[in-house]
Design a protein with these regions (language model features):
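Aromatic (Trp/Tyr) and acidic
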Residues: 1-138
Length: 141
């Protein structure tokens, strides 16, 4: 967003939108990686978080780690899936993702990722608001 504001260069617009789409469900698992967003969609429901697991507190807007290479996942210690793998059909030899409290590698909320997501959402809102506030050239009133 800042890069585009300063340089007026739009070469990364498509990449930005693709990342946004991927985080919110246009990915091999068809699920958002953001707890509770979008509303009424497939989002993480059983994150590796004591707040939700023990206290039943929602962490709306929290970005989970997301997929990890299968080769890494298979060598991690201490991962136990507590529920049947609802994404088993979509798992591959390349990458896996589990919406399961027991998988800290793919389903743990991440502070740095959530902070970056907050920036992305704020930038999108600012971009939308500025377009809405300034009338288009040649538009009739």
């Amino acid at each position: 967003y800042w890069y585009k504001q300063i340089t007026k260069d739009k070469q990364f617009d498509e990449l930005e939108q693709s990342n946004f789409d991927w985080l919110f469900g246009c990915n091999p698992w068809g699920t958002s990686m953001v707890y509770g967003l979008p509303a009424n969609a497939d989002t993480p429901a059983d994150p590796h978080s004591a707040f939700t697991h023990l206290g039943h507190y929602p962490i709306d807007g929290g970005l989970v780690d997301g997929p990890v290479y299968t080769s890494i996942y298979k060598n991690l210690i201490g991962i136990t899936l507590y529920q049947p793998d609802e994404y088993a059909t979509f798992q591959s030899d390349l990458a896996v993702y589990h919406d399961d409290y027991g998988d800290y590698s793919t389903n743990e909320p991440t502070m740095d990722g959530t902070a970056s997501l907050i920036y992305l959402l704020a930038a999108k809102e600012a971009e939308y608001s500025s377009k809405k506030a300034s009338p288009q050239k040649g538009a009739s009133h």
